[in-house]
Amino acid sequence: MVDKFELPKWLLRGIEESFPLRNFDQTLSSKINDANKSKSKLRVKLGIDPTGTDIHLGHSILFKKLRAFQDNGHVAVLIIGDFTAQIGDPTGKNKTRVQLSEEEVKENSKTYLNQLGMGKSSDKSILDFDSEDRIEIRYNSEWLKNLNLNSIIELMGSATVSQMLAKEEFNKRYNSQTPIALHEFLYPLLQGYDSVAVNSDIELGGTDQKFNIAIGRDLQRHFKQEPQYGILLPILTGLDGIKKMSKSESNTVGLSEDSLSMYSKLEKVPDNIIPSYFELLTELDLTLLKDNNPRDLQRRMALEVTSLYHGKEEALRAQSNCEKLFLGLKEKVGEIPIISLKEIVFPVKFFYLLSSLNLFKSSSESKRSIKGGGVKIDSYKLVNPDLVFDSKEDLSGKILQIGKKIIKRFDN
């Protein structure tokens, strides 16, 4: 729930929830207003664990909101979880994560900061790295690697096992007798301690981070600090229109992708996710969603997002090139052999679908080809063989390409 009638417009857009509604008899909106009146700067924390090499549009929602705080005079406290990344956030995982090496985490951290625009002027970067009084980059190894056993025991003593088991992922694993490593219980406490270390006023996170942010509030209270507010933003649905945007689902748009790739992916998103992409990825007026056909909205949204990361001129060039490719394909679409979905029982896994259609000799061959990047649908390279298609409508009319030779069009 959000105190929607009071929050400033620049902050309100896209927020799913803010909590608590009151903190020491003060609302989040009044805290922001008081800070603005007194010209004091709020410390707004966003933590990222560099567990991969790419930042995608799903991540960008949080960075855009952090930038909004910067543009309104507050301090972005960007925490690079170089220590916690070696543990791995158990949120959304049904098994223990593989731990990363220190070198892997360091390399990933560099690529993250480059993608966020470090070294670029503020008008060309996602975060404002130019205004030194509005950015603070911290690595949580600064304080976490020096914690002694007494400090760790104090942290662990501030929470209970029942609290930890209230976390959805832990609860599911406990009930299904799937192992939970003890170090995983430490993760929310260490992330929460980050809030103590930087004395944050507000923490940003996805809706899946509410538990961890709440632990941060508890720890700040334990260490005699004023507890932070939490601001939660939605988890972006991926290009398939079904599952959350995730590299493992092959449904992402990376910030480092070239303009043509970015535009061509975005202009094909399913109709059901156009409104959320408009709201979360652009600053376009949401009234445009009324009385406009989906195709026009797709193009408008794709152009706006591509412009944000590549500039207007480059985005227009990508749009033009994409339309030329589309027209060329449209002329040939009647020549593409049709492959019928009539005999397929849905829902169906991607690898099984292809082997059932006799496009591969076996399921294992199908899996290998998909994992190797040899299969595309509507120009998207899908690398997850276990991707599930729920109905014929997910595929009907789409073009399947296997390698360079096999091109077919799905039909009901």
Swiss-Prot record:
Where in the cell is the protein located?
A: Cytoplasm
Q: What class of enzyme is it?
A: ligase
Q: Which GO terms describe its cellular component?
A: cytosol
| Subcellular location, principal | cytoplasm
Q: Where does the chain bind ATP?
A: K247
- Which stretches make up the S4 RNA-binding domain? 348-411
What is annotated about its quaternary structure and interactions?
A: Homodimer.
The name this protein carries in UniProt is Tyrosine--tRNA ligase
